[in-house]
Amino acid sequence: YVSPPKINQTLQSLSSFSEEMRQRGQQASSRVLHATVEAANEQVARALSVLAGTEVVRLVRVRLADDLPIALESSHILAAVCPGMLERHDFASESLYQVLRQEYGLRMTYAHQTIEAQVASEPELKALECKPGTPILSIVRVTYTDADQAVEYVRSAYRGDRYKFHTELHLVETPKLHQSG
C-alpha cells in the first residue's frame, strides 16, 4: 500500500478548508456531525470575548478531500452575527466562510492560531477513520472580521498522515549590540 501524498497547506494566509482544496484541484466536502445553536461555555466565551451563555452556532464536521477524511472541525460562531444560518444552509456541501461573507457581510480578515502535535483521541480516531496511535495536528483558531470582532472559535484535528503545513520564514535583522572593551 502506498499512501497518498500529504496535503500541503501554507501558513501565510487565512483561507477556508473549501478554498484550500479548490486551489489544489481537490473536491472538498463535509460530513456534518452536529449543528445546533447553544450557550457558549467558559472556554468558547473567553475566546470570543463574550459572556458565558451567549448563543453560538456549534458546527461539527468531518472535512474530506476527494472523499478522504482529513480533519475533524468543531466551529463556534456568534449566533448574533448569523441568524437563521443553520435553517437555510447545508454545510455538508457549502463553505461556512462563503456563507458568512455572502449572506451576512462578514469579512474574515485575520486569525490567531496555535498548532500542536498530539495523538488522536478515541472520537477523533472514529471520525477520521484512522488507527490508534495516529498523530494529529491539533489546531485552535480564533477568527476576526475586518471590524476586529472575534466571530469564530474553532478546534480542529488534522490527520498527521495526510496533512502538513508549510511556511516561509525571513530573517529579521536585529540591531548589533555595542561591545565595550
Regions found by a protein language model. Name each.
Residues P4-G181:
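All-alpha effector-binding/dimerization core of bacterial HTH-type transcriptional repressors
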